[in-house]
Swiss-Prot record:
It comes from Geobacter sulfurreducens (strain ATCC 51573 / DSM 12127 / PCA). Its main location: cytoplasm. This is Translation initiation factor IF-1. It is found in: Cytoplasm. One of its GO terms (cellular component) is cytosol. Keywords: Cytoplasm, Initiation factor, Protein biosynthesis, RNA-binding, rRNA-binding. One of the essential components for the initiation of protein synthesis. Stabilizes the binding of IF-2 and IF-3 on the 30S subunit to which N-formylmethionyl-tRNA(fMet) subsequently binds. Helps modulate mRNA selection, yielding the 30S pre-initiation complex (PIC). Upon addition of the 50S ribosomal subunit IF-1, IF-2 and IF-3 are released leaving the mature 70S translation initiation complex. Belongs to the IF-1 family.
Length: 72
């Protein structure tokens, strides 16, 4: 059984939360809870409110995601 493909969407960080979690507003208006991917943690990439980010969403739970990229 293979994993389902993740859905990649663009969004804007609204507010930081404890434990490297962020509330992100997607381009379609939905608000999701997202955490930082492991590589971003490893290389200490900082994310601030207002940053444009790419979020991966699981097809099973569209309310939570993983931040995989921060736009410059």
């Amino acid at each position: 059984m293979s994993k389902e493909e993740a859905i990649e969407v663009e969004g804007t960080v609204i507010e930081p939360l404890p434990n490297a979690m962020f509330r992100v507003e997607l381009e379609n208006g939905h608000v999701v809870l997202a955490h930082i991917s492991g590589k971003m943690r490893k290389y200490f990439i900082k994310i601030l409110p207002g940053d444009k980010v790419t979020v991966e969403l699981s097809p099973y739970d569209l309310t939570r995601g993983r931040i995989t990229y921060r736009a410059k």
